[in-house]
Amino acid sequence: MKPYLLEHEELKELSAKIGGWRIMTNHIEREFNFSNFVEAFSFMTKIALICEKHNHHPNWENVYSKVIIKLSTHDLGGITNLDQTIASEINDIFEK
């Protein structure tokens, strides 16, 4: 998938398409909470495999049972269709 920057109208519609994610100036972000560290780390491991498949890696942090993920396409300087795709796949994993 060749990434392209999302236009203003696409960004306005993005929240409805990827529930739970906040649209920021140059990235999208979401916080995920789990009952313990093992669940949080397991979630991160699943996401790592998706990101590797797309060759697109998030900025993220993990503190015990909390995972915060920030997605942007640094090469293009903002939020792209690839960020949207990965956010959607992350939501699918979280909801399982």
From Swiss-Prot:
GO MF entries: 4-alpha-hydroxytetrahydrobiopterin dehydratase activity
Please state the Enzyme Commission number of this protein.
Answer: 4.2.1.96
Could you tell me the keywords of this UniProt record?
A: Lyase
Superkingdom of this protein's organism? Bacteria
What catalytic activity does the UniProt entry give for this protein?
(4aS,6R)-4a-hydroxy-L-erythro-5,6,7,8-tetrahydrobiopterin = (6R)-L-erythro-6,7-dihydrobiopterin + H2O
Spell out the family assignment given in the record's similarity comment. Answer: Belongs to the pterin-4-alpha-carbinolamine dehydratase family.
Provide the protein name: Putative pterin-4-alpha-carbinolamine dehydratase
Which species is this UniProt entry from?
Prochlorococcus marinus subsp. pastoris (strain CCMP1986 / NIES-2087 / MED4)
